[in-house]
Amino acid sequence: MAKGEGNLLAQNKKASHDYHIVETIEAGIVLTGTEIKSVRAARIQLKDGFAQIKNGEAWLMNVHIAPFEQGNIWNADPERTRKLLLKKREINHLANELKGTGMTLIPLKVYLKDGFAKILLGLAKGKHDYDKRESIKRREQDRDIKRVMKSINAR
């Protein structure tokens, strides 16, 4: 099974539109009991999320996990900072890549793997507006070519 192909719970669809994804890496997430119940119910939003390396540790920021409905007093803050579980070598590699290069770590997917919540992070560089327009133009051209080929083959 390829990375990010487990029981998919959430996906950041705008990531490939807004960023050039250079590299991906899988990490575990430290969650409380009510948070994992909300994640299993797919009540998580990755849209504005990002990850940072601070003091040799990886942290997930701005990812919204909705409060568990039956959690009452045990619910944590939906926007709290969550620790990511990575090996020291992976953290050092990411820290070197992020240092002064205009790169960022963004969450791409959240899924379950062997009962544990995993997140697929992308090492990404932001796209300019003209890059986005080129991507859209290329996609439309491919769609037009497929449409013409389909009409030719249908005859």
UniProtKB/Swiss-Prot annotation:
Its main location: cytoplasm. The keyword RNA-binding applies. The keyword Methyltransferase does not apply. Pfam families: SmpB (PF01668). CDD domains: SmpB. Required for rescue of stalled ribosomes mediated by trans-translation. Binds to transfer-messenger RNA (tmRNA), required for stable association of tmRNA with ribosomes. tmRNA and SmpB together mimic tRNA shape, replacing the anticodon stem-loop with SmpB. tmRNA is encoded by the ssrA gene; the 2 termini fold to resemble tRNA(Ala) and it encodes a 'tag peptide', a short internal open reading frame. During trans-translation Ala-aminoacylated tmRNA acts like a tRNA, entering the A-site of stalled ribosomes, displacing the stalled mRNA. GO terms for biological process: trans-translation. HAMAP family: SmpB. This is SsrA-binding protein. Coiled coil: none annotated. The lineage of its organism: Bacteria, Bacillati, Bacillota, Bacilli, Lactobacillales. It comes from Streptococcus uberis (strain ATCC BAA-854 / 0140J). Keywords: Cytoplasm, RNA-binding. InterPro entries: SmpB (IPR023620), SsrA-bd_prot (IPR000037), SsrA-bd_prot_CS (IPR020081). It is found in: Cytoplasm. Belongs to the SmpB family. GO terms for molecular function: RNA binding.
